[in-house]
Regions:
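C-terminal beta-signal and adjacent terminal beta-strands/loops
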Residues: 589-612, 626-630, 637-692
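A beta-strand signature from Gram-negative outer-membrane beta-barrel systems
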Residues: 121-172, 183
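Surface-exposed extracellular loop regions of Gram-negative outer-membrane beta-barrel proteins
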Residues: 110, 257, 261, 405, ...
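Transmembrane beta-barrel wall of Gram-negative outer-membrane proteins
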Residues: 178-204, 217-254, 271-300, 332, ...
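Extracytoplasmic beta-strand/coil segments of soluble accessory domains associated
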Residues: 68-110, 139
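Gram-negative outer-membrane beta-barrel transporters
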Residues: 386-390, 476, 501-593
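Outer membrane beta-barrel strand-and-loop segments of large Gram-negative receptors
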Residues: 323-335, 370-380, 450, 456, ...
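Short, acidic, small-residue-rich periplasmic hinge/interaction motif at the N-terminus
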Residues: 22-60, 64, 68, 94, ...
Length: 692
């Protein structure tokens, strides 16, 4: 059993945490709602969650109606490549993140999980487009630091997405058309009781429609479709939800004929097909009996990805390459909460987590195949105390990992202390949380550890001044039992791993840490004028080396900054109908992702491995992509009519067409390091209509 460092254990004797009426900075003003009103829209599993609204997903620039891209505007979050929604949270690898839907853990719910990655390999944590439609979501949240005792299996960020129920009185429709895709949503009651509803949404990609008509983009055709369904039933004191998310995507690249067109990079030597499928099913419920409440559910989800790379012209040095990655996840949880009196409440529960992943990687003359996974059972208990501006929760979680070569059992204390006075608040959050090492287990066997424990401490001060809130946060994370591999004498930890590495390295024990400071301010109101939200963070992510020194990790970007500004102008048209013009502007900047040297792949195999040359880290992450900067713009016009509300919007990502470096790889055809750039100016026009 691994115990949280003893110097922090005395804090367990301190009352701690959360103020449910705490002011929260939003994109358009300040959430300052009574507790009951907040709960009517989104009940965060913990006040630690930074909640966001679906309206913000629709309104803010650069989101493309993807909640993950909205989360990229939050403090401490870096979008690793703007072609996709992989997020590094406070210097952690995106593999440290976890997606939850209605409180249940699910697999990566994104199409084209290979988007924006180093060698077009699929990943376990992000992708180009989210398969969960924003039209299905209620207001949701994101946890970037400590977790409540109910949640685990993530040491980076946790997406806490919530499905909204359908309308229980009459049928309603929504339709949306744009350069991302075409959506059609239908919701309405089932029966006459007014207690049961359905909500379904179907979507097909705009690029897929163009591909069906024979149009491609630089030799590539990209398609995706998804279908979301939610059945909801409520009764006095309780509710039941059944949901499903299914979809598929493909990205097909046709290499040019070298006799007709000059080859400019190694990619053009091949025909490349990428296909993926996602399936997510779940059930969640809650019920209250007097002072007792019960909630829980289960989910089953899986993803299947298949990438094939066939040479346009067969030759001994241009072999085919195939890669499949098929993760699956089953999750179940149950929580019992009891309100003891006006000051105390108690919670007790358990979470079951079973994750398996299989893969096959073939380079022509050789390859790798296998699987990885683990099963975990985590009972937990918590106590909440609140009085006179002080709210406290103390919890302990016991995460047990088995069905691995080495079993692990972690005690994970969770404490969170917050005190409010005179429009100010001070919060201390201390805890530990663990996660299994799936990506690392796929790359090497055996591992020194199959699950790791991360300790963290967050200290946050906030103050409200009129319509404005300012916040300052200090945080640190430590993973003393991390794993990594050595390249010469340099240790590359798991915190620098996102994609598959074809070298199959031998892993060793490692120690990692992340620490930083965040400053944030927000205020104004879209109802009354201009509003803004801005943040800046300074941070480091490091791994201890053999000589005891600390070296920067891949996602140690040094700094990140965001600023969003917006305003709406309501008016009446000539027929006295409501019309609103809106403007939103966002600036995003951060330090560059780090990388090693790009060199040829030396291997005894004479096959396509040379087209997937891994970086040389013998001298560490000595290079950087340089400062990233991107301005986004969104203009929209909303018309409210008797039976409909329509919105015409122009969303422009990278409005200044800034050239940002994405990565540097070794091109075996050109025989030199080659730069890839992130997205330039991307205009997205959309039209949305809601029938009331």
């Amino acid at each position: 059993v691994r115990i949280f460092p003893s110097l922090l254990l005395p804090l367990l004797l301190t009352v701690f945490t959360s103020a449910h009426s705490q002011d929260t900075i939003s994109f358009g003003g300040i959430y300052d709602l009574p507790g009951a009103e907040v709960r009517a829209t989104y009940t965060p599993v913990s006040p630690l969650a930074q909640r966001f609204t679906v309206e913000e997903v629709y309104r803010l620039p650069g989101t493309f109606y993807d909640p993950a891209r909205l989360v990229a505007l939050l403090p401490g979050v870096v979008q690793t490549n703007d072609q996709a929604n992989h997020l590094s949270v406070r210097g952690n690898t995106p593999n440290a993140n976890l997606w939850r839907l209605n409180g249940l853990a699910i697999v990566n719910p994104n199409h084209t999980a290979n988007a924006g990655t180093f060698y077009d390999f699929p990943t376990l944590s992000g992708g180009g487009v989210n398969a969960i439609s924003a039209q299905m979501l209620g207001n949701s949240g994101f946890l970037s630091g400590g977790l409540p005792v109910e949640y685990g299996y993530a040491t980076g960020g946790t997406f806490d997405l919530r499905l909204r129920p359908g309308n229980k009185t009459r049928r309603k429709y929504q339709a949306q058309a744009g350069f991302i895709g075409f959506d059609l949503m239908v919701e309405g009651p089932i029966g006459d009781s007014g207690k049961t509803s359905y909500l379904v949404n179907g979507r097909y990609s705009f690029t897929g429609l163009l591909a069906d008509m024979g149009v491609d983009f630089g030799g590539e055709s990209i398609r995706f479709w998804d279908f979301n369904a939610h059945l909801h039933h409520e009764w006095d004191g309780g509710e039941l939800s059944l949901f499903s998310i299914v979809g598929a995507s493909s990205n097909v690249f046709a290499g040019p004929d070298s006799t007709e067109q000059e080859i400019t990079e190694q990619k053009e030597l091949f025909d490349i097909d990428f296909d993926s499928e996602v399936q997510i099913y779940g059930l969640s419920f809650s019920h209250q009996v007097k002072t007792n409440s019960f909630r829980g559910g289960f989910s089953a989800s899986k993803v299947k990805t298949d990438r094939s790379q066939m040479p346009v012209n067969i030759s001994p040095t241009r072999n085919a390459a195939f890669f499949t990655l098929d993760p699956g996840l089953f999750n179940a949880n149950f929580v019992w909460e009891k309100k003891i009196n006006e000051f105390y409440s108690f919670k007790l529960g358990v979470e079951y987590f079973d994750q398996t992943t299989t893969y096959e990687l073939s380079f022509g003359n050789g390859g790798l195949s296998g699987g990885a996974g683990y099963t975990s059972l985590a009972p937990f208990v918590g106590l909440v105390y609140s009085i006179n501006g002080l709210t406290a929760e103390v919890g302990i979680r016991n995460s047990n990992y088995f069905n691995t070569p080495v079993s692990h059992s972690f005690l994970e204390p969770r404490i969170d202390l917050q005190y409010e006075w005179n429009r100010q608040s001070l919060r201390l959050n201390v805890g530990a949380q663990s996660r299994g090492l799936i990506a690392e287990d796929l790359m090497a066997f055996p591992l020194p550890e199959y699950a790791v424990l991360t300790n963290h401490l967050d200290l946050t001060y906030s103050r409200r001044i009129g319509e404005h809130i300012v916040k300052a946060a200090l945080y640190c994370q430590s993973t003393p039992n991390d794993v990594g591999f050595q390249d010469n004498s340099f240790i590359v930890s798991s915190n620098s791993i996102l994609e598959f590495d074809p070298r199959s390295p031998d892993f060793v024990s490692a120690e990692t840490r992340r620490y930083g400071v965040e400053l944030e301010a927000g205020g104004g109101s879209k109802q009354s004028g201009w509003y803004y939200r801005g943040s800046i963070g300074l941070f480091n992510a490091e791994t201890q080396q053999v000589d005891g020194s600390w070296a920067k990790d891949r996602f140690s970007n040094d700094f990140n900054g965001k600023l969003t500004i917006g305003r709406e102008w309501p008016r009446l048209d000539k027929k006295q109908r409501e019309t609103t013009l809106g403007l939103n502007f966002a600036l995003i900047t951060h330090g560059g992702e780090r990388y090693g040297r790009s060199i040829p792949f030396t291997s005894t195999f004479d096959d396509s491995r040379r087209f997937f040359a891994p970086q040389d880290f013998s001298n560490g992450f000595i290079n950087s992509n340089g400062t990233y900067f991107r301005p986004d713009l969104r203009l929209y016009k909303t018309k409210t009519r008797k039976k409909t509300t329509t919105t015409l919007a122009l969303d422009v990502q990278n409005a200044a067409n800034v050239q940002n470096l994405g990565n540097v790889y070794y091109d075996a055809f050109l025989e030199q390091p080659t730069e890839r750039y992130q997205l330039g100016l991307i205009p997205v026009l959309s039209y949305r209509i809601v029938w009331r």
